[in-house]
UniProtKB/Swiss-Prot annotation:
This is NADH-ubiquinone oxidoreductase chain 6. It comes from Dictyostelium citrinum (Slime mold). The keyword Translocase applies. The keyword Magnesium does not apply. It is found in: Mitochondrion membrane. It is a multi-pass membrane protein. Its main location: mitochondrion. Keywords: Electron transport, Membrane, Mitochondrion, NAD, Respiratory chain, Translocase, Transmembrane, Transmembrane helix, Transport, Ubiquinone. It is an enzyme of class 7 (translocase). Its EC number is 7.1.1.2.
């Protein structure tokens, strides 16, 4: 199997799992499909010889963010009926997004230029009747920036350009956003736990206080039975 075929299969799996996540109301199934997407992304990085980024992607996303998301969903205890009612409102937006995705894929596909040998173009009639395999070269019209940095490694490029270089501010902002998400989860779950404890305290039966009450003071609305 060629590299292009493998990439197309991985992209197809990613798109399929994305729509499954959007349509699923079970958070466990959503997490499993999300892990499959992360694995496909890591496989794509491995095909372009970025082993370190692929390992970091699996460790960070699958090992941390996916578990954090599952922790949030399980602690908040989202009602599935409410999710189903909410998802019905966004069907039109999902349809529009699907049409937009098809349009973007069409633009990317039509953005390729096909080069044919000059001797084939010179004799067009022979080209139509020729049964032999002719070499057709499809080259993208965009600039491949990976070839400009092919002499360096992904670890060196990430360390010199992303973490400790000109893009370090975005790396720091991503860390702050992740920290805010973790603190927000703790704050939300703490409020829920406190409210649950207060509710249980109000429902608790205190027999001593009930026995010591006077019925004339406690019972206000009554009628005399003759």
């Amino acid at each position: 199997m060629s590299t292009l075929g493998l990439l197309l299969i991985l992209l197809g799996i990613i798109i399929t799992c994305t729509f499954v996540i959007l349509r699923s109301v079970n958070p466990i199934y959503s997490i499993l499909n999300l892990i499959v997407i992360y694995g496909c992304y890591a496989s794509i990085l491995l095909t372009v010889e970025m082993e370190f980024l692929a390992c970091i992607y699996i460790l960070v996303n699958v090992g941390a963010i996916a578990v954090l998301f599952l922790f949030i969903v399980m602690m908040i205890n989202i009602n599935i009926v409410e999710i189903q009612e909410t998802m019905k409102k966004y069907n039109i937006y999902m349809f529009v997004g699907f049409i937009g995705l098809i349009g973007i894929m069409g633009i990317l596909i039509t953005n390729y230029q096909i080069r044919i040998k000059e001797e084939v173009i010179a004799d067009f009639s022979m080209f139509l009747l020729n049964t032999e395999i002719t070499t057709l070269q499809a080259t993208p019209s965009y600039l491949d920036f990976y070839e400009l940095f092919v002499e360096t490694t992904d670890l060196r490029a990430m360390g010199s350009n992303v973490i400790y270089g000109s893009q370090s501010i975005w790396f720091i902002m991503a860390c702050i956003i992740l920290l805010i998400g973790m603190v927000g989860v703790i704050y939300i779950t703490e409020d829920l736990i406190i409210e649950k404890r207060k509710l249980n305290a109000r429902r608790r039966q205190d027999i001593n206080s009930q026995v010591l009450r006077e019925y004339k003071i406690t019972i206000k609305n009554y009628r005399e039975i003759k």
